[in-house]
Design a protein with these regions (language model features):
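Glycine-rich phosphate/diphosphate-binding loop of Rossmann-like nucleotide-binding domains
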Residues: 6-7, 11-42, 152-240, 287
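A short helix->loop->beta-strand "cap" motif at the edges of active sites that frequently abuts
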Residues: 31, 86-90, 109-112, 259-262, ...
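N-terminal beta-loop-helix "entrance" segment that forms/cooperates
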Residues: 34-57
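An anion/phosphate-binding loop that grips the pyrophosphate of nucleotide cofactors and donors
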Residues: 67-68, 232
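Short glycine-/small-residue-rich Rossmann-like dinucleotide-binding loops
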Residues: 69, 75-76, 95-96, 221, ...
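Phosphate/diphosphate ligand-binding glycine-rich loop within oxidoreductases
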Residues: 70-148
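Adenosine-phosphate binding glycine-rich loop
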Residues: 118-159, 168, 269, 274-370
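Rossmann-like adenosine-cofactor binding region
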Residues: 209-291
């Protein structure tokens, strides 16, 4: 199979779909891999690195989209990329379609086969291709939040860990999943007062066992979320409904109740955000103010650490990619319901329920297509 790796063109996105090691794994199996010129440069991978692993360097994205049977990316196709997608071409990347109707309609029109990293499951119902970037984003959320709390960033002028004789900052993490757990790793390491809010008592017990008294586990149904939000210094939104738009847990009124200079980091912004006042931002202009509360809503947080992110992502995405290349998408998806869960758009049809519900578009059961 001919596999294409175009350069990411989303603003401030520096990751690349495949590392040289991943390409070596494909070329050893006699697959042809086309990499756009300097596509991996910002992630620390040179053209020479890719050539040594058997890739061919291609000058333009147009040529890659024209020749490749399968396109591997990191972020969702931008609209000028959508125009290059061919009928029957496989697109393998993060899509986050539930909050992107124009993109979804464009992919439907292209009649391509779109497999979303974020909805592929495993036997336990987890999201193994989303997990590595959720882990990175969770860790970055505290790093970004700590910086935004500084006075010259319009924050409260607080250090998360306080100082001798000075209280630590209150950190509230919404969601105890991969994002929340990894945010807690960094927040507790910085000695913040860390609250993790989740609806699952079992999950909170697991986190309490992991972190001990370093966190305050909080059941969402048994707490006054408005009070908790009003008293926090840093709020991290890490709530996820797989493949669907994130629930708006924090209202505009709650934001108004927060202290001047408090910080919101909405990691769920890729799926629309879990805070009513959140709008997507970029690494170039990451923050804005609403009611004197600093909002950090970068939609591709892991793109800021592209080398770490690309290597972590490839460890998760490569096994399915090799199967797709070796035996084609029909056999691969038909034989494995967890892989089939990744199919979001198939030749003009929406095949993921969360996307169809969020965008009010017709749904077709993917299991009946092959």
């Amino acid at each position: 199979m001919i596999v294409g790796v175009p350069k990411e063109i989303k603003l401030q996105e520096h990751r690349i779909g495949l590392t040289p090691d991943s390409i070596r794994a494909l070329t050893k199996k006699k697959h042809e891999v086309l990499v756009e010129n300097n596509a991996g440069f910002e992630a620390g991978f040179t053209n020479e690195d890719y050539l040594r692993c058997g890739a061919k360097i291609i000058g333009t994205p147009e040529e890659i989209f024209k020749k490749a049977e399968l396109i591997v990316k990191v972020k969702e196709p931008q609209m000028n990329e959508v125009e290059m997608i061919r009928e029957g071409q496989i697109i393998y990347t993060y899509l986050h379609l539930a909050a992107a109707k124009q993109l979804t309609l464009g992919l439907m029109k292209s009649k391509s086969i779109c497999i979303a990293y974020e909805t592929v499951t495993d036997e336990e119902g987890r999201l193994p291709l989303l997990a590595p970037m959720s882990a990175v984003a969770g860790r970055m959320s505290i790093q970004a939040g700590a910086h935004a709390l500084e006075k010259n960033q319009k924050g409260r002028g607080l250090l998360i860990g306080g100082a001798p004789g000075v209280d630590s900052a209150n950190v509230v993490i919404l969601g105890g999943g991969v994002v929340g757990e990894n945010a807690a790793i960094i927040a507790t390491g910085m000695r913040g007062n860390v609250y993790i809010v989740d609806k699952s008592k079992k999950r909170l017990e697991e986190l309490h066992k992991q972190f001990g008294d370093k966190i305050i586990p909080t059941e969402s149904d048994k707490t006054d979320l408005k009070k908790l939000v009003s008293e926090c210094d840093l709020l991290v939104g890490g709530v996820l409904i797989p493949g669907a738009e994130a629930p708006k847990l924090v209202t505009k009124e709650m934001i108004k109740s927060m202290k001047r200079g408090s910080v919101v980091v909405d990691v769920a912004i890729d799926q629309g955000g879990c805070v009513e006042t959140s709008i997507p931002t970029t690494h170039a202009n990451p923050t804005y103010l609403v009611d004197d509360v600093v909002h950090y809503c970068v939609a591709n947080m892991p793109g800021g650490v592209p080398r770490t992110s690309t290597m972590a992502l490839n460890k998760a995405t490569l096994p399915l990619l090799i199967k797709l290349a070796d035996q084609g998408y029909k056999k691969t998806l038909k034989e494995n319901k967890n892989y089939l869960a990744g199919l979001n758009v198939y030749r003009g049809k929406i095949t993921y329920k969360g996307v169809s519900n969020s965008l009010d578009l017709d749904f077709v059961d993917a299991s009946k297509l092959f």
